Amino acid sequence: MKRLLLITLLIGYIYPCVAQDKPIRTEESLEGTVIYKKTTTFEVDGYTYQCDVDDGSQFVTLYNKENKLKYEKIVYKDTGKTYIGSWSSNVIEYDRFMSQQADFIVDQAFTKAMADEIGKTELMITMLLSPNTGEVMEVNFNFFTFEPYAKVPLHVYREIEVKLKEQIHFKPIEEGKQLNYIMLAWMQKPQGKLPPLPPPGSLM
């Protein structure tokens, strides 16, 4: 009986310590149903987003309703002639730090739970830059209705847009300065971030 009592006391002492050292994490995951399945306007917390869905391909374009350039062609300001880019033509100076920072912003907007559910599927992010300052003027997102990104809460996309506008800027070169705007797009599989741990001694 004394031995059983000792074991019981030890378990009662050790368990709270283990629970405090390894708190249970609770973090946001993807929505259970598709959010962006048809052309819709979303009005949330003081901002408005437009979701355009191509009925045939189910290709989604998600962007701030205030955007003006999404469906505008890239043209030379002086002549109005359409700009045709190529892999060999540059319109901005390469900036490794800014490129990495843009990736980081996208990663941090997603929780680890979301990133795990998304798997290897990539999201397309497009930034439209000012040809004068190189600052981000608009941000667009693209994916398909049958991909996990169609279940990502709107505030995640909003966070990416806001932080890209606040933190990212590139230096346009002479060619870029002649355009009405500069487009930069990339595909990324978000890594997600771990949620903050609770204060020492507390349980979630």
State where each predicted segment sits:
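Positively charged n-region of N-terminal signal peptides that target proteins for export
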Residues: M1-L4, Q20
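Charge-biased low-complexity segments
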Residues: Q20-M204
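Sec-dependent N-terminal signal peptides
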Residues: L4-P16
